[in-house]
Amino acid sequence: AWACKLKKIPCLSIGHQAAVLNAAVPQPAHTDALGRAVLAHYAPSKHALSFHYLPYHKNIYTAIIRQELRLMPVTNAGHVTVYLPAFGDKQIIRLLELFPEVDWQVFSKHSKESYRVGNVFIQPINSKSFLTSMASASAVLCGAGFQTTAEALFLKKKLMVVPMRGQIEQQCNAAALAALGVQVLKSLKPKRREEVAAWIKHDQHIDLYFPDNAAEVVRTILTHPLLKEASNEATPVVAYKPFRKKLITRIFNPAGKKGRS
């Protein structure tokens, strides 16, 4: 993006970050001005095609849900799937063990081996195991990152998020999630016990629609006026076909497996 800006070449921004800064998207009551400035200038572009929980704007699509998850059976085995990479295992366990009646399945980036502390089962991060756990969970407790929260909502799981402090994107996601009815927890301190207890006790009904929109997004990108204009000017034409191939491969075959469409 910066290379394009410096060379005065039009750039199309694709991703979630552009949606976070869109005025049509719910915003937190108090924002970090410096964080917003960094996010706005990290990959500057006047043209954007982005993703969020709802199509808040004509240039915002709902999240692209990977086919692997779309094809998974959705059940309720009674456990709660937990993914909080910003917190250490001890900090997570200290809060979760206050609820011995709950089966907590924690995926940790800090642990290389699985172990159990009472009703809290800690295991290393593994994409397949995590998706299986989430698809069969009664609820999901996670950070306010976009992908995991969108996937939990797609699976129609009860959701609670703990946004990372100082991370403007997660703070904005949390504001959007709160507007949808998702419980937002400010920290994992034991004083938050009653909030967690209330979340465990009560049901949550958030019915969002995430259409299988990957092909539509690809078509929109490839027919975008900016790309047509660029093709006429011949500046980025050399990169057009490789870009298209990589984009389609990334969306329809994210794991790089042969034979998947």
What role is predicted for each listed range?
Residues 1-18:
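N-terminal glycine-rich phosphate/adenylate-binding segment common to multiple enzyme folds
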Residues 2-6, 42, 52-60, 72-75, ...:
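Short loop/helix-cap segments at secondary-structure boundaries that form the rim of catalytic
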Residues 15, 19-89, 107-110:
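A nucleotide-sugar donor-handling region in carbohydrate enzymes
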Residues 64-139, 189:
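Donor-nucleotide binding loops and adjacent catalytic segments primarily
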Residues 194-261:
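C-terminal amphipathic helix plus adjacent low-complexity
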